[in-house]
Amino acid sequence: MPELPEVENVRRTLENLVTGKTIEDVIVTYPKIVKRPDDAEIFKEMLKGETIENIKRRGKFLLLYVTNYVIVSHLRMEGKFLLHQEDEPIDKHTHVRFLFTDGTELHYKDVRKFGTMHLFKKGEEMNQMPLADLGPEPFDAELTPQYLHERLQKTNRKIKVVLLDQRLLVGLGNIYVDEVLFRSQIHPEREASSLTAEEIERIYEATVTTLGEAVKRGGSTIRTYINSQGQIGSFQELLNVYGKKGEPCVTCGTILEKTVVGGRGTHYCPICQPRI
């Protein structure tokens, strides 16, 4: 699933490609992707004649701002936005097409069909689901060690489960939580309330640093991720633990292990990340 670094790179590349383009028509071949309004036909009619003004990101969501509305899109596992010419072949996994007046088309492709789109009037999007309950952005001033400390001390859930909760902070998924906890030297099954202030400080620093580095490297291409210009990321070359079960730890040489935490495959070093 694309996490914050991947979605941010999609945002940047997509904004360069489609800002200023006017939507002439919308073709939806898999209506279940459109969650709001309930009728995909209404979604299509509302967007006709709208011009894309800019594209923002909130956590793992893309926000496409047009003249009067905002399209809130979640890519889920395999979603991709790619720009095409009108005469190019249409991939069988293309489920939404935004046809522009200049003859180009923005295609939303999704092999798994898990992605979603919500359409809101401008100004309504942040106060309604799916954005209303999201926590702070990792790079915002609102996220501080003190913020994390106050919230982590109130829950006995395992720290990995807590960090995956987008209500605490946004953007972390399975890949980057494993990497953050390795850099923090925290076992993924530690109870959040057991963490010291110093350990929480390490988690904060590792979160900001890891995500920042991953954004600069274009994200991580583990399976099929590409940005909207068709480019892969390179941060996968710097991963320390994710997907590396059975390999030696880069720090101590111990063989890395994999377990399941909160239903998610979890990679860690049993020596560098002791379960106290």
Curated annotation (Swiss-Prot):
Keywords: DNA damage, DNA repair, DNA-binding, Glycosidase, Hydrolase, Lyase, Metal-binding, Multifunctional enzyme, Zinc, Zinc-finger. Binds 1 zinc ion per subunit. It catalyses: Hydrolysis of DNA containing ring-opened 7-methylguanine residues, releasing 2,6-diamino-4-hydroxy-5-(N-methyl)formamidopyrimidine; 2'-deoxyribonucleotide-(2'-deoxyribose 5'-phosphate)-2'-deoxyribonucleotide-DNA = a 3'-end 2'-deoxyribonucleotide-(2,3-dehydro-2,3-deoxyribose 5'-phosphate)-DNA + a 5'-end 5'-phospho-2'-deoxyribonucleoside-DNA + H(+). DNA binds at residues 93, 112. CDD domains: EcFpg-like_N. PROSITE patterns: FPG_CAT (PS51068), ZF_FPG_1 (PS01242), ZF_FPG_2 (PS51066). One of its GO terms (biological process) is base-excision repair. It comes from the Bacteria. Its cofactor is Zn(2+). A zinc finger (FPG-type) spans 240-274. Its EC number is 3.2.2.23, 4.2.99.18. InterPro entries: DNA_glyclase/AP_lyase_DNA-bd, DNA_glyclase_Znf_dom_DNA_BS, Formamido-pyr_DNA_Glyclase, FPG_cat, MutM-like_N-ter, Ribosomal_uS13-like_H2TH, Znf_DNA_glyclase/AP_lyase, Znf_FPG/IleRS. GO terms for molecular function: 8-oxo-7,8-dihydroguanine DNA N-glycosylase activity; class I DNA-(apurinic or apyrimidinic site) endonuclease activity; damaged DNA binding; zinc ion binding. The active site is at residues 2-3, 60, 264. PANTHER family: FORMAMIDOPYRIMIDINE-DNA GLYCOSYLASE. Monomer. Belongs to the FPG family. Involved in base excision repair of DNA damaged by oxidation or by mutagenic agents. Acts as a DNA glycosylase that recognizes and removes damaged bases. Has a preference for oxidized purines, such as 7,8-dihydro-8-oxoguanine (8-oxoG). Has AP (apurinic/apyrimidinic) lyase activity and introduces nicks in the DNA strand. Cleaves the DNA backbone by beta-delta elimination to generate a single-strand break at the site of the removed base with both 3'- and 5'-phosphates. This is Formamidopyrimidine-DNA glycosylase. It comes from Bacillus anthracis. The lineage of its organism: Bacteria, Bacillati, Bacillota, Bacilli, Bacillales. The gene is mutM.
